[in-house]
Design a protein with these regions (language model features):
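Metabolite-binding pocket within alpha/beta catalytic cores that recognizes anionic/polar moieties
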Residues: 2-149
């Protein structure tokens, strides 16, 4: 039996958009760039050859378009792990829940998420303002303790 998400668990706006992000499932690409500041979204999207949507809802801004022939979404998360949790949870819902039936879709849709922006560092040899590329990240905030799996 498929899991059903009650209206209190999955908030969908009357226009079919997910509650916090204001994005509809068809407006989400499989490749998503996450930035903190909403002002960075148009900066990243300026590299798109075309844009299909530009959505500003609360502190979240989302632009989906095409970059070098590939469909991509760039979205702001705001500041902090709480906001990032909301974004990632709602991105998964957009990709993997049928909004009409409120059930998990039969085929899993994998999203590729790339974080682009500023970060703290715990290594003494990394200076403020230095550019780094990470393969992984580790949160010391305890958020993962709230998830099963």
């Amino acid at each position: 039996m498929k899991r059903y998400f009650a209206p209190s668990e999955l908030l969908i706006e009357p226009n079919g958009a997910i509650y916090h992000l204001g994005v509809k499932p068809e407006q989400l690409a499989d490749k998503v760039i996450l930035v903190g500041d909403p002002g960075r979204v148009p900066l990243v999207a300026s590299h798109f050859s075309e844009q299909e949507c530009d959505i500003q809802h609360r502190e979240f801004r989302t632009i989906t378009g095409t970059y070098k022939g590939k469909r991509m979404t760039v979205m702001s998360t705001g500041i902090g792990i709480g906001n990032i949790d909301i974004c990632v949870t709602e991105l998964d819902a957009l990709a993997n829940i049928d909004f009409a039936t409120r059930q998990v879709k039969p085929e899993f849709r994998k999203l590729t998420l790339v974080r682009l922006g500023t970060s703290g560092a715990i290594q003494e040899d990394i200076e403020v303002g230095e550019t780094i590329f990470s393969r992984t990240s580790l949160g010391f905030d305890g958020l993962l303790n709230y998830y099963k799996g």
